Amino acid sequence: PGRSVAVNSGRRALEYILRRLGDVRCVRVPLYTCRTVVETMERLGIPVITYRIDERLEPEELPELEKGEYLLYTNYFGIKEKCVDRLASRYGGSLIVDNALALYSPARSGVASLYSPRKFSGLPDGGIAVMDAERSLPEPEERDESLPAAAFLLECLEHGQERASAACERNERR
């Protein structure tokens, strides 16, 4: 279910989703999440409200969401499928699923999801935004450059892994 758009990174997939949703007043994000998730929202001027998760990696409390509020849930390592299903039933289009660590998790009807294939494959970058849409999603208005992200692979081939390690680390931090 849903249509997808390929972008350059998981953070760009999240940005694409947030821009397509339109009037996003705030997003509730788990405390245990990648810093790039919060940085993406800050860059877009979207307020972030954090929530706690329990030892099962599930929200301690399920908030009531008002119009323009969204809940971002991280499908940790792809092991939280039942929780994603429960949240999708409760929140529908107000749920954004972060499947950056769950490449093989199916998209849910009516729910936006983001994926980061590079975390599962030998790819220097890559992201996928999935949204439930009646028609094809438009291409992103702007794209990141992929060349800087892939340069360390060529450096590794030509000069060895040791010499390319600093470039690889820079790619991971971007």
Predicted regions and their residues:
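PLP-dependent aminotransferase class I/II
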Residues: 2-5, 10, 33, 53, ...
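Generic low-polarity alpha-helical segments
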Residues: 14, 27, 97, 128-129, ...
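Conserved beta-strand scaffold positions in the cores of enzyme catalytic domains, especially
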Residues: 4-6, 48-50, 95, 113-114
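PLP-dependent aminotransferase-like
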Residues: 3, 12-90
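Active-site phosphate-binding strand-loop segment of PLP-dependent enzymes
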Residues: 54-151
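Short, Lys/Arg-enriched charge-dense amphipathic segments
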Residues: 28, 50, 122-127, 162-169
